[in-house]
Amino acid sequence: MPQQGSFSQAEYASKKKQTRRDKFLAEMEQVVPWPRLVARLAPLYPKGERGRPPFPLERMLRVHFLQQWYALADPAMEEALYDSQAMRGFAGIDLAVDAVPDETTILNFRHWLERHNLAKGLFDEVSALLEERGLLMRQGTIVDATIIAAPSSTKNKEKARDPEMHQTKKGNQWHFGMKAHIGVDVASGLVHTVVGTAANEADVTQTAALLHGEEEDVFGDAGYTGADKRPELADRDVSWNIAIKRSIIRDLPKALRDLAEPVERALAQVRAVVEHPFHIVKNRFHHQKLRYRGLKKNTAQLHTLFALANLVIVKKALLAQPGR
């Protein structure tokens, strides 16, 4: 993004040490397909024909992505743009000549994305790019889900917990929130499908929604037992590789158990690929608790987060490929 030059920017550019943030943002500058994403959003972006002209679309998209990478609320994002030269440089903001989007503008941009279902559009655009580059294959899918906690407190304006979130028990612990269900490409570990549900929705119920229809093999943990017998999947000509429950393995005769355990270990190694995008979203992007109310808003954010996670996963391959 073209940037204005200023003394502060020149001074920052001349510093000798490159921080981890500098390095990450420099990589994202190159791997995010900015012209392609802006073109996807532009037809619906307000033209500012009445009143104050809107901020440039690409600048607002960059600020929105900064929010996702650093888990910043709207007020914190506004403050970060004043505090961090690295973030301002990435967003193309020079304080000497440019206005900084305030928290309301940042909020309104996110609401605009949600209103037009554009987070899903951004996810689809990134997926299309990765498929064109030969990085996203379609021969096999791993299905999995993770719980993301929602605030359980009733100390809010509505004086109630989010009615679209629910409790579920995992092991001996109860969790309140939603589930992020993903379909992941076996060969690359890239996410090709994202579905959001309440936390009490059984994993197996979303299996059909997580398949793109071209896969030959499907892998899942024991939470997907019986997927092949569900009516919506009865006509799928795929090889089902679903983990056997540990209690069943444990109760097998020793001879059968000795045969089953190596197979289960091999399948577990294949399924382990699915943990990488979850790790990036929850640990690198720090998305461990829901920020918004309602499944629609939070699922929209998940589409953005997993699109960005995909770019992180293949950043080396994209950086090695000239042009975009």
Segments from the language model and where they lie:
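Helix-centered, glycine/charged polyanion-binding patches within enzymatic domains
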Residues: 2-11, 216-217, 222-296, 300
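Alpha-helical support elements that line or immediately flank enzyme active sites
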Residues: 59-71
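Charged, often Cys/His-bearing segments associated with DNA-binding zinc-finger transcription factors
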Residues: 1-35, 39-42, 320-323
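A short, flexible helix-boundary coil/loop motif
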Residues: 259-261, 284, 316-324
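An N-terminal domain-cap segment
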Residues: 40-58
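A short glycine/serine-rich beta->alpha loop
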Residues: 46-52, 95, 292-296
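Polybasic low-complexity intrinsically disordered regions
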Residues: 2-8, 57, 75, 79-82, ...
